[in-house]
Amino acid sequence: MRKDIHPNYQEVLFHDTNADVFFLTRSTVKTKTTREYEGSEYPYYPLDISSASHPFYTGEQRKTSTEGRVASFNKRFGAFGGRKKAADADAAE
């Protein structure tokens, strides 16, 4: 077998920033920061959402800190090219 062709598979500390929950698991993700957890130093990777904070798994509806791309587009450009309301159409006649 050839050497050095596989990514480094190591223990990584994932942090769900919305729920403030830490997960220690193995992954090939590359990180620049490390953090101490339960007396050992691990590579650290922050997450916006995980199973600890996702509405499907928690059963509660909550707003996330980031919007979807479609929602932000509609927020910016929703008024352009839309249909006129009935009151506006009557006033125009």
From Swiss-Prot:
Keywords of the record: Ribonucleoprotein, Ribosomal protein
GO molecular function: structural constituent of ribosome
Pfam families on file: Ribosomal_L31 (PF01197)
S-S bridge residues: none
GO CC term (a single one): ribonucleoprotein complex
Gene3D superfamilies from the UniProt entry: Ribosomal protein L31
BP-aspect Gene Ontology terms: translation
InterPro entries from the UniProt entry: Ribosomal_bL28/bL31-like_sf, Ribosomal_bL31, Ribosomal_bL31_B, Ribosomal_bL31_sf
Record text on subunit structure and interactions: Part of the 50S ribosomal subunit.
The family this protein is said to belong to: Belongs to the bacterial ribosomal protein bL31 family. Type B subfamily.
Protein name (Swiss-Prot/TrEMBL): Large ribosomal subunit protein bL31B
Species for this entry: Psychrobacter cryohalolentis (strain ATCC BAA-1226 / DSM 17306 / VKM B-2378 / K5)
